[in-house]
Amino acid sequence: MTQMVKNELAKKVLIPLLVLSLLAAMVGVLTRTDFVRAEEAPQLPKFDIPALSSEHKTSSLPNVIVVATGGTLAGKARDDDPTNFQNYAAGTYLMSDLVAQLPKKDKIADVSTFQFGNKGSGGYTIKELYDLSLAVDAALEIYDSAVVTTGTDTMEEISYFLDLTVRSEKPVVVTGAMRPWDVIGTDGPANLYQAIKVAGSGKTKWFGTVVMLNDVIYAAREVTKTNAHRNDTFDAPMFGALGYVDDPAVRIYRAPARATKAGTPAWASPFDLKTISKDSLPIVEIVYAYQEAGGGSIRGLVEDGAKGIVTAGTGAGGISSKQSAARSAAIKDKGVVFVSTTRTGSGSIYDSGSGNVIGGDNLNAAHARMMLLLSLAFTNDVNTIRGWFTTFGTQDVEISVDENTVLSTSVEEPVVTEPVITEPTPEAVLPTATVPPTEPAVTEPTPEATAVTP
């Protein structure tokens, strides 16, 4: 084979191989770039939310979806004992079966169900709450309002997480039960029915998430469980109820501060979960203050990876000297953000305006933890977090009315028509002469006409 032939063969073989290698390298780079981009974009979960039925589409009733997570409401008494109030398996019954048992529900709403999960409230992780919030928003793209059923143990935390993250302004009503579904005197069916009624009424639109048990409606930010067993366990210290369900009416007597911002950008929470991955949700813990409390709990939690810590302090948020020293070290060495709350159950802790310790206002420790956890998922800037706590995290009401705004009553006064009185004109009035009274005429008989009787 001559050298010329060898050169021609090399050109025909090697050049295509070089081109293919170059193309492969380019494809590899593009593939890696796309992979990085895909990793940067959060992988959002998908939910099999039921579509509206054709019957519900044409119905005049509100359509309500019940998003079920389990809890005592869906619990089954053990040994089939209807008097077994405390020994039961939470999250046993399916919500579709429970809703089917509600009498006359078709008089108040068209009800559908979505079974998100079926376990006790304390069994859910923060990542699962991330999914739950997105599921509720997905459901509200179809339905007028949503009821979320959960266990009562951590209901105040789950409901406040939803309040802080659900993007829709439509009503979200959280409910549950203190007694399992199949025992005598269970509160489950009534709570479920009344929650559907509240959601269907539309009266809590723009309120954020509310909690309804025992016929009482509370703001998610304010509500807390106060008793381990009683049916009326939920309360809102300092604030009280938003309203009540008094058959057949749903009565709302006050609104949360957030509702005053309805229809404005300020209404929306800063925590849009669609923009972050669930893996970015940080570890945030709670430390309880007590007499001569040590600092080991703070040091241990920081070592375990906590990015934020809420202290439930004595009185107006006080912590022990050892806890204070551990807190200072955590801030200096790790940049941990702290929120100060009170263990008393009510009262406000005001913010100093600087540093890594933020006043929790009147949030309880469990609520403040959710607020801090979400804040740290979106920023590491403590001043931004402080701003969120002192604005969206408070219930401080500010009402401002544009000076050019004209307020008018919605009551229309009836038009009053005055009677028309026609006065005589001066020209038409003639003076009347005074005529002296005349004596009545008396006819005297004439002599000739007088009859004489002999």
Outline where the language-model segments fall.
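Sec-dependent signal peptide cleavage junction
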Residues: 26-40
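Ser/Thr-rich, Proline-interspersed low-complexity disordered segments
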Residues: 38-44, 413-417, 423-454
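ATP/NTP phosphate-donor binding region
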Residues: 39-137
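Accessory alpha-helical/coil subdomains and C-terminal extensions
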Residues: 61, 67, 77, 94-105, ...
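Short Gly/Thr/Asp-enriched flexible loops that form oxyanion-binding sites at enzyme active sites
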Residues: 149-170, 320-328
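Internal gly/pro-rich beta-alpha loop/helix module
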Residues: 175-247
